[in-house]
Amino acid sequence: MAAKDVKFGNDARVKMLRGVNVLADAVKVTLGPKGRNVVLDKSFGAPNITKDGVSVAREIELEDKFENMGAQMVKEVASKANDAAGDGTTTATVLAQSIITEGLKAVAAGMNPMDLKRGIDKAVAAAVEELKALSVPCSDSKAIAQVGTISANSDETVGKLIAEAMDKVGKEGVITVEDGTGLQDELDVVEGMQFDRGYLSPYFINKPETGAVELESPFILLADKKISNIREMLPVLEAVAKAGKPLLIIAEDVEGEALATLVVNTMRGIVKVAAVKAPGFGDRRKAMLQDIATLTGGTVISEEIGMELEKATLEDLGQAKRVVINKDTTTIIDGVGEEAAIQGRVAQIRQQIEEATSDYDREKLQERVAKLAGGVAVIKVGAATEVEMKEKKARVEDALHATRAAVEEGVVAGGGVALIRVASKIADLKGQNEDQNVGIKVALRAMEAPLRQIVLNCGEEPSVVANTVKGGDGNYGYNAATEEYGNMIDMGILDPTKVTRSALQYAASVAGLMITTECMVTDLPKSDAPDLGAAGGMGGMGGMGGMM
């Protein structure tokens, strides 16, 4: 086992604080509407330019291992805030830096670290309750657009696009962000259920001008198996041909003789058929087939539940108003499934979302909810260069997370004002002893830090602005974009309550751990092994001449 380097008490805390400051100073320059850019070097390609706090934090690794531990713990604050609310990473970092700096000063002055932590926790718990009381529901699209605009660094077009997307697909709908092809941002909305599987044979195409298969009021056969023998499908095909409607087959695969026969029947006009593979893999494929069955009012023909394809009837088939299939995607529009069954299925998937542990699973489940509940919107980000595209895409994603958080828990006045108001409301809070009171004061002072940093970034004097804002009440604050005072909510400067709450809670949590740190342990740096060329007696062979 490698030897360890151990530091105690003040030595450890000073090193840790130095690491915290390096990371926080790099992140906090991006805060506010006049936040600066940070340029990140990449080992290949052009450097990345960003104003996204968590992107900056992720890039930072320090050479000194003790300092790096401090930096990594604050990075954890940014990541946690990002995971919980999708935004507020810079605010969380600024809060954490302030609590750690003031807290460590108090520890150095002889205060008890555990009591300080208790005081900080008490203040934060009270602040969270006050934040909830200040929160205003965010329901109309104007408020949603304002939240999106603020989070996208005052880019109004992004705010409007997100509000429009939410109008189209609902609050629960899936909104994804992709690279666009032009200079303008665009919004694409896919109505109905779409999945990433195209036609199995180009011979199914009946709209050559668009290269797509369009089926009007088709029957939909859902099979959880490979279909290679046409005989087992004959009863269904005959029944569909009699009904005079087209048929869409969604199965694990359709191959060989079965596919060839379907193609021939389609080309001869005997029965209009198209076949696609079922979306997903393994258990997820079974679940998605069941989703489609619920949406279209059909049944999944599965041998697991004792159903055979030969015995399938028209009652087992789903139906939809229209189906459009192209090379890569299939879209089912207006399935005839019962609304109650669809809502039941959505509720069931929501329950799974609550229990999901990984982000990937949660995202996939949310996509399934959206496909059942209404549709998917795609925001295509336009930009002149790839560097600008990356930067803008990160901002749009942030704005999207912020608007979701706003719809969930409501909004408070932005620009750091909500925390100032909360701090003034809990200013009389007292702990059980003097050290806890100092902890409460540390937390209250930290709540001013975001406003001060926003003001500093736009080149004004933080103390003057902070005192003016404290002198006002309600939503009165400082608009850093226009450099004027007024009602923040009326000016459209809003922060999602969830973002502000998460930032404060995670900052206090990690800062509390760091204040109560008494010892740090890390591996000693390995001493470089001697160069083999210089080792041994070989280098000294030249001296052998003296032996003669």
Swiss-Prot record:
<comment type="similarity">
    <text>Belongs to the chaperonin (HSP60) family.</text>
</comment>
<dbReference type="InterPro" id="IPR027409">
    <property type="entry name" value="GroEL-like_apical_dom_sf"/>
</dbReference>
<dbReference type="GO" id="GO:0051082">
    <property type="term" value="F:unfolded protein binding"/>
</dbReference>
<feature type="binding site">
    <location>
        <begin position="30"/>
        <end position="33"/>
    </location>
    <ligand>
        <name>ATP</name>
    </ligand>
</feature>
<dbReference type="InterPro" id="IPR001844">
    <property type="entry name" value="Cpn60/GroEL"/>
</dbReference>
<keyword id="KW-0067">ATP-binding</keyword>
<dbReference type="GO" id="GO:0016853">
    <property type="term" value="F:isomerase activity"/>
</dbReference>
<keyword id="KW-0413">Isomerase</keyword>
<keyword id="KW-0963">Cytoplasm</keyword>
<feature type="binding site">
    <location>
        <position position="415"/>
    </location>
    <ligand>
        <name>ATP</name>
    </ligand>
</feature>
<dbReference type="GO" id="GO:0005524">
    <property type="term" value="F:ATP binding"/>
</dbReference>
<protein>
    <recommendedName>
        <fullName>Chaperonin GroEL</fullName>
        <ecNumber>5.6.1.7</ecNumber>
    </recommendedName>
</protein>
<dbReference type="Pfam" id="PF00118">
    <property type="entry name" value="Cpn60_TCP1"/>
</dbReference>
<dbReference type="GO" id="GO:0042026">
    <property type="term" value="P:protein refolding"/>
</dbReference>
<dbReference type="InterPro" id="IPR002423">
    <property type="entry name" value="Cpn60/GroEL/TCP-1"/>
</dbReference>
<dbReference type="InterPro" id="IPR018370">
    <property type="entry name" value="Chaperonin_Cpn60_CS"/>
</dbReference>
<dbReference type="GO" id="GO:0140662">
    <property type="term" value="F:ATP-dependent protein folding chaperone"/>
</dbReference>
<comment type="subunit">
    <text>Forms a cylinder of 14 subunits composed of two heptameric rings stacked back-to-back. Interacts with the co-chaperonin GroES.</text>
</comment>
<feature type="binding site">
    <location>
        <begin position="479"/>
        <end position="481"/>
    </location>
    <ligand>
        <name>ATP</name>
    </ligand>
</feature>
<feature type="binding site">
    <location>
        <begin position="87"/>
        <end position="91"/>
    </location>
    <ligand>
        <name>ATP</name>
    </ligand>
</feature>
<comment type="function">
    <text>Together with its co-chaperonin GroES, plays an essential role in assisting protein folding. The GroEL-GroES system forms a nano-cage that allows encapsulation of the non-native substrate proteins and provides a physical environment optimized to promote and accelerate protein folding.</text>
</comment>
<feature type="binding site">
    <location>
        <position position="495"/>
    </location>
    <ligand>
        <name>ATP</name>
    </ligand>
</feature>
<dbReference type="InterPro" id="IPR027410">
    <property type="entry name" value="TCP-1-like_intermed_sf"/>
</dbReference>
<dbReference type="InterPro" id="IPR027413">
    <property type="entry name" value="GROEL-like_equatorial_sf"/>
</dbReference>
<feature type="binding site">
    <location>
        <position position="51"/>
    </location>
    <ligand>
        <name>ATP</name>
    </ligand>
</feature>
<keyword id="KW-0143">Chaperone</keyword>
<keyword id="KW-0547">Nucleotide-binding</keyword>
<dbReference type="GO" id="GO:0005737">
    <property type="term" value="C:cytoplasm"/>
</dbReference>
